[in-house]
């Protein structure tokens, strides 16, 4: 196994990827790389003290089922743990009013504002991963062990998938809570489907991602193949679009050019990044970066690093957010962020 760990050595990453062609690479890019990639400065404190770029290269691996993970790692006795948001609703409302000012001035049309939750546990990271997977059994969950940290990612959002020179992105925008009562669950889905606000939000981000794809694809190859689809997660409904194209550059170059994802920044992207830097209380670290794999053939599959826990010793960090537009309300957006954290809170209860 080979390892690449650095703060911002993008040339070193490209060399590592080339040298390990034919192996399976698994790793992540921290959101904080956006400062270098987009020429921004930050005065925000780091929140996780992780490498900004971290990859492992494997010669051998095997596939296992989620049931194998649960059987091997679910605890026979409960552990002690807790999770709570750092931001209160009144504090969120104050920041929300500042965002609305930027929206009314036309500086941005949509922004993804996020806030952290912190916790602690005496459970091992593998046990915690299994507990969350039991209540949130999504495909493509990812567990990664670093030198002094573990990552537990349950992201539902595909950022970039590149196979045989074909590229696809599936930005998520639009969220509704789910319930165990079938009739009410369908009613919540219908409300999401009919919401002008949620439709507009997805359209904005779809246009942004389509423009981003045009920068890395052959002219005329970018297509919106699905304008609005539904994704059913255990705790929430999401809507997403699907955009495809034919790659005109290397997979890694495309990943870096489009980084970070438009669905977790806003539009226009550069100004949204600047306002995020102004209003959020700490650097995002891995959160809303990209996490995934490069297969032995050079195909790439990365997800947006949302619904992702960082564990360092007994300390846990999680971040949640939502897209805010001119007709959003602070109360609804704050509730949406906590709804997204529900699987983690439920697993840690």
Predicted regions and their residues:
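Extended alpha-helical targeting/anchoring segments
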Residues: 1-349
């Amino acid at each position: 196994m080979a390892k690449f760990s650095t703060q911002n050595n993008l040339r070193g990453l490209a060399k590592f990827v080339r040298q390990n062609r034919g192996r399976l690479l698994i790793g992540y890019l921290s959101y904080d790389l956006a400062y270098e990639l987009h020429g921004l400065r930050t005065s925000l404190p780091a929140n996780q003290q992780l490498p900004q770029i971290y990859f492992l290269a494997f010669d051998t691996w095997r596939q296992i089922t989620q049931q194998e993970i649960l059987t091997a790692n679910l605890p026979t006795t409960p552990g002690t743990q807790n999770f709570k948001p750092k931001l209160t609703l009144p504090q969120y409302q104050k920041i929300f009013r500042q965002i609305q000012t930027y929206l009314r001035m036309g500086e941005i049309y949509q922004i993804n504002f996020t806030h952290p939750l912190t916790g602690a546990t005496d459970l091992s990271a593998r046990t915690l991963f299994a507990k969350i997977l039991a209540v949130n059994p999504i495909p493509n969950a990812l567990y990664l062990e670093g030198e002094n940290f573990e990552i537990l990612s349950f992201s539902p959002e595909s950022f970039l998938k590149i196979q045989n020179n074909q590229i696809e992105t599936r930005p998520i925008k639009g969220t509704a809570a789910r319930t165990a009562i079938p009739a009410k669950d369908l009613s919540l889905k219908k409300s999401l489907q009919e919401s002008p606000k949620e439709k507009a939000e997805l359209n904005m981000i779809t246009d942004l991602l389509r423009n981003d794809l045009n920068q890395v694809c052959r002219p005329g190859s970018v297509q919106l193949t699905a304008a609005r689809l539904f994704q059913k997660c255990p705790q929430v409904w999401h809507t997403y679009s699907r955009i495809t194209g034919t790659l005109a550059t290397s997979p890694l170059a495309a990943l870096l050019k489009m980084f970070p994802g438009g669905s977790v920044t806003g539009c226009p992207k550069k100004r949204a990044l600047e306002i995020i830097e102004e209003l959020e209380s700490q650097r995002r670290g891995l959160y809303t970066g990209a996490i995934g794999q490069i297969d032995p053939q050079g195909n790439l599959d990365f997800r947006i690093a949302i619904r992702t826990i960082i564990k360092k010793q007994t300390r846990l960090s999680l971040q949640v957010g939502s897209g805010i537009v001119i007709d959003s309300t602070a109360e609804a957006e704050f509730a949406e962020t906590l709804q997204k954290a529900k699987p983690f809170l439920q697993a840690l209860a």
